[in-house]
Design a protein with these regions (language model features):
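Acidic, glycine-rich active-site loops and adjacent beta-strand->loop/helix elements
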Residues: 1, 75-81, 107-112, 136-141, ...
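Condensing-enzyme catalytic core mediating Claisen C-C bond formation in acyl metabolism
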Residues: 1-49, 146-203, 207, 300-304
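Conserved beta-ketoacyl condensing-enzyme motif
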Residues: 4, 49-114, 219-242, 246
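Fold-independent oxyanion-binding glycine-rich loops
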Residues: 7, 135-138, 162-164, 172-174, ...
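Conserved catalytic cysteine-centered active-site region
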Residues: 27-47, 78-131, 242-273
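Predominant activation on well-ordered alpha-helical scaffold segments within soluble catalytic domains
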Residues: 54-58, 87-91, 114-121, 157-161, ...
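Structural signature of cysteine-dependent C-C bond-forming condensing enzymes
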Residues: 62-70, 96-101, 125-134, 207-210, ...
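Flexible, glycine-rich active-site loops centered on histidine and acidic residues
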Residues: 123-157
Length: 304
């Protein structure tokens, strides 16, 4: 049996009320009032993607044997080093063995976390690895008075994969890759360049995620009704609900997108939502996880 052996997360303690943003910046861009609910998580001045990843990894590995880890994969779109192995820093902070361990960075799109998880699971299934720690973290800067400022939050999550003491068995995966430019950030740039919102909602989230989930169901023979929780990131509230309707999902089975409590944490967000679902899961529950970013990865797990 291969699957998740432990999980952890880290959300910075600081919060920014979205209403405070509205009170100060709505004069410039009034549309932000439409998404002013709740608050977003904000990293402290001395935090970055690596420090948050380490915190999530510590939470994940509490009480576990770190010496048994033979792979550390770090996913992020905001890695602080361009020419230094960021995953190696996380591994060193955890005192993971230097010899016989494969560390790797996964980057360049917000589905990098799930791609790293699939790579880890395939490595374990093939017998090349025994225990792989996958961590995803993001600290995305935004321009003031933009929808991204309202939507994005900072955070990290970690999943340990292996064959022993599995708490959620891996049941399969499916991926589609689409060079869909909902946003992009060039080298050396501080902020994303975003395309028109309706394009992102309707042709991005609203089309790509349902298509990927349908492909997974067709590949595995599973049915959407089999799942107790279905997880997919989408910071557009109406589109998040619309995807569920398109899939024929009971709204009660859709995992909350956590907009009101922390915001969208980028590469970490599918894992952040998965950790929240695992906290409330019961043995036998099946959980489907999808990501989004120049395509979509879909994974399924069954809680043991």
């Amino acid at each position: 049996m291969v699957g998740i052996t432990s999980y952890g997360g880290y959300i910075p303690r600081y919060r920014l009320s979205r209403m405070l943003v509205v009170q100060n910046m709505a004069w410039y861009f009034p549309v932000i009032m439409a998404v002013a609910q709740g608050e977003k998580a904000v990293a402290n001045w001395d935090e970055d993607a690596i420090s948050m990843a380490v915190a999530a990894a510590y939470d994940c590995m509490a009480g576990k044997d770190r010496k048994a880890i033979d792979g550390v994969y770090l996913a992020s779109t905001t890695l602080p080093f361009a020419d230094r192995l960021n995953a190696g820093i996380v591994a060193t902070a955890l005192n993971v063995p230097e010899n016989g361990t494969v560390n790797a960075d996964f980057a360049a799109c917000t589905k990098a976390g799930t791609t790293a998880a699939i790579a880890a699971l395939e490595a374990i299934e093939s017998g090349q690895r025994d225990n792989v720690l996958v961590v995803a973290a993001d600290q995305r800067g935004t321009k003031m008075a933009t929808m991204y400022e309202m939507f994005f939050g900072d955070g990290a999550a970690a999943l340990s994969f292996g064959k022993d003491d599995v708490i959620a068995e891996f049941k399969g995966s499916y991926s589609i890759n689409v060079d869909f430019v909902d946003h992009y950030k060039g080298c050396g740039k501080d902020f994303d360049y975003g395309w028109e919102e309706r394009w992102v909602r309707d042709i991005g989230y609203g089309k790509v995620i349902p298509e990927a989930i349908a492909g997974f169901l067709n590949k595995t023979g599973m049915k959407i009704e089999d799942f107790s929780k279905v997880i997919y990131p989408c910071y557009f509230g109406g589109t998040h609900r619309g995807i569920a309707k398109k899939l024929g999902l009971d709204p009660a089975k859709v995992q909350d997108n956590m907009h009101a409590v922390c915001g969208d944490t980028g590469t970490a967000h599918p894992f952040v939502m998965l950790v929240a679902a695992l906290e409330e899961a019961n043995p036998g529950d099946k959980i489907l996880v999808a990501s989004f970013g120049q395509g979509c990865d879909v994974m399924a797990f069954e809680v043991t």
